[in-house]
């Protein structure tokens, strides 16, 4: 055991700085204000003050992203389920015009028409994505409680089998943010 101690200390020194520097993203006043500045693609203009003290879901997506399609269905289901609880769902469009995807300007409109989101959809979110921990993978979803602390953070990892957050996972995160038991029933 004594021989392993230097190795263990070295391992802690190598691993501890990244763990200590990892910042938990919260939905603070600056992030709420930045979200409110984004153009509304679907729904009404967002009011930052209306997000104060509420459970807020923030989902980053692009219309060309295959996992974002079923995730939008789950966001719609969450909207129907939790609307009476005052939950706000915001979908933030990022990476829409990159690479070969910039050649189809009508793709986003077709996506929104097909998915018919019953929640706020905001455009031009690249700068806001930086405020949420440099979102560089989609879909990425956060659920924030009324205090602004996250109860769920999902990132679609490259090559992962799990490609998007399920309705059940959203429901557990939202219920935790609401202070309710984590059951997944409607």
Regions found by a protein language model. Name each.
Residues 143-186:
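Thiol-/selenol-based redox modules, centered on thioredoxin-like
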Residues 60-77, 100:
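Conserved redox-active cysteine motifs that mediate thiol-disulfide chemistry
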Residues 86-102, 117-126:
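Thiol-based oxidoreductase modules, predominantly thioredoxin-like and allied folds used
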Residues 55-56, 139:
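Alpha/beta-hydrolase fold active-site loops
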Residues 106-144:
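Short, internal strand/loop/helix patches
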Residues 21-48:
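N-terminal "domain-start" segment that seeds a small globular fold
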Residues 54-55, 70-93, 113:
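Conserved helix-turn-beta segment immediately C-terminal to the redox Cys motif
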Residues 6-17:
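Bacterial N-terminal signal peptides
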């Amino acid at each position: 055991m004594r021989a392993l101690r230097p190795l263990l200390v070295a391992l802690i020194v190598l691993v501890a700085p990244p763990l200590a520097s990892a910042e938990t993203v919260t939905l603070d006043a600056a992030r709420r204000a930045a979200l409110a500045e984004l153009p509304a693609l679907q729904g009404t203009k967002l009011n930052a003050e209306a997000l104060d003290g509420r459970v807020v879901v923030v989902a980053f997506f692009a219309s060309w992203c295959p996992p974002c399609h079923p995730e939008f269905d789950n966001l719609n289901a969450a909207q129907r389920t939790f609307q009476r609880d005052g939950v706000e769902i915001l979908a933030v469009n990022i990476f829409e015009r990159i690479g070969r995807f910039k050649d189809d300007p009508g793709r986003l409109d077709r996506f929104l028409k097909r998915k018919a989101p019953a929640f706020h959809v905001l455009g031009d979110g690249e700068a806001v994505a930086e405020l949420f921990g440099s979102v560089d993978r989609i879909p990425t979803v956060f659920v924030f409680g009324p205090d602004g602390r996250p109860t769920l953070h999902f990132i679609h990892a490259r090559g992962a089998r799990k490609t998007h957050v399920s309705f059940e996972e959203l429901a557990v995160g939202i219920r935790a943010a609401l202070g309710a038991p984590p059951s997944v029933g409607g």
